[in-house]
Amino acid sequence: MASADETGQELRISLFTTLPKRYVVTSAPIAVPANLRRRGLSSLINSMLDLDPPKPFDFLIEHEYLRSSLLDHVLQSQKDGAEAIIKVEYTLAMPPPQPGPSMPHEDWVGGLASTSVNGQEWLATASYDHHGRLWLPKRTECERVLQGHTRPVLGVDFITTDHSESVDVATGGMDQAVRIWQHRETESRVLVGLGHRGTVQCVAAQPTGNIVASGSWDHEIFLWSCVPDADDLDSAPGNKRRKVDSLYNEVQLKAPLGHLHGSGSVVHDMAWASVDTLYSVGGDHAVRQWDVEAGKLKMTQVGAKTGHGVAVHQGNAEHLTVATADVDGAARLYDFRTAGGTSGTTVLRSFTGPAHAVAFNPTNAYQVAVCGDEAIVNLEMAYPIKIWDRRSTRMPLHNLRVPAAEVPRGTERVDSYRMLALTWTPSALFAGGASKRVHAFHTESVQ
């Protein structure tokens, strides 16, 4: 059998890319040494494009990243590379994310969310210490503590509003309450939603900021208006209006605006795709698509396992990818079409324990991160965060774990490998969990 180390042997390849025009080379077949690897191909692309400074490229053959020589890859794929023209896709390589300073908490971090206000990134966290928190990650400083829940807080999300200076947040937790925190220059208030009969596992804010959805262990999805009731605020009895602290000086109790019935078990996570379309996952092994305006279930895709996390990426008007983090340790990608149904399911095998959360890269439509538990004895082999390129399912792009220096003293070492929440901003991937910290992994834009 031929070896990639043999000299003189050549293969014919055809290069193509989905990158911008400035990175496009001819797709005409060319002959290259069979022992060429990623670095050699990258040098070839840089030479053809005359790039200065040069850029690192990555390469895919039939949806698998090239991690050996061209010939070895062809032989492993059981293809007759000597006779065929090999189609090679190239893309800009993603540098390994670099760990940054962490943000400490008093207890486990159960939820994470991110947003940008006037060009400044914000993080929101939900913690088992009964509090939510707002952070400026560039300074790793806690800007605000959201006090009011009486039990662990599990879900958190930012609310987009017309008030460009405001940072509004929704939280939910084991006290069965939903809290909407609104901060204005003239006044601040907390809207407290009551009605769930079980732990509120997750909250998700509508893109317009008018509605917050909450999912619970009572199998229900409730919808809450983010608009205060003027009549109640003007004439509410004492139990509906009370001081909470010097920042959020008004509380208003609210009943649900509506319900979405049809979940067969606990609702673990939700994500909005548009102002009227919501996706949910939970203990009933299904990804559910909801028509919020009509108040009904629109579509159900049966999954392989219980879903712990869900995220959506809107590629275009007719192409939506839904990613789930599942109890069997895998992330799954569902290709939803507006015409109905799904087109295939991609499985990304990630962990020996359960996967807990999933997030898309906001600057690269192909990349998705998933976090979870590694149920293995040798912790040196454990990487609780993985970054995948959804074009390649054999192995992740990057395996990440918390640096030893970022694990607090007194924390069980295994806890630093149990990540429960993720969020991805243009500058960094953030993860939190049993280590009682939010860990930052700074990413570099390659466009």
From Swiss-Prot:
Chain segments carrying region Ubiquitin-like (UBL) domain: 11-92
Function statement: Required for maturation of ribosomal RNAs and formation of the large ribosomal subunit.
Extent of the WD repeats: 107-147, 148-191, 195-234, 262-300, 304-344, 350-398, 414-447
Localization of this protein: Nucleus, Nucleolus; Nucleus, Nucleoplasm
A single GO molecular function term of this UniProt record: ribonucleoprotein complex binding
Name of the protein: Ribosome biogenesis protein WDR12 homolog
Organism: Monosiga brevicollis
Annotated SUPFAM superfamilies: WD40 repeat-like
PROSITE patterns: WD_REPEATS_2, WD_REPEATS_REGION
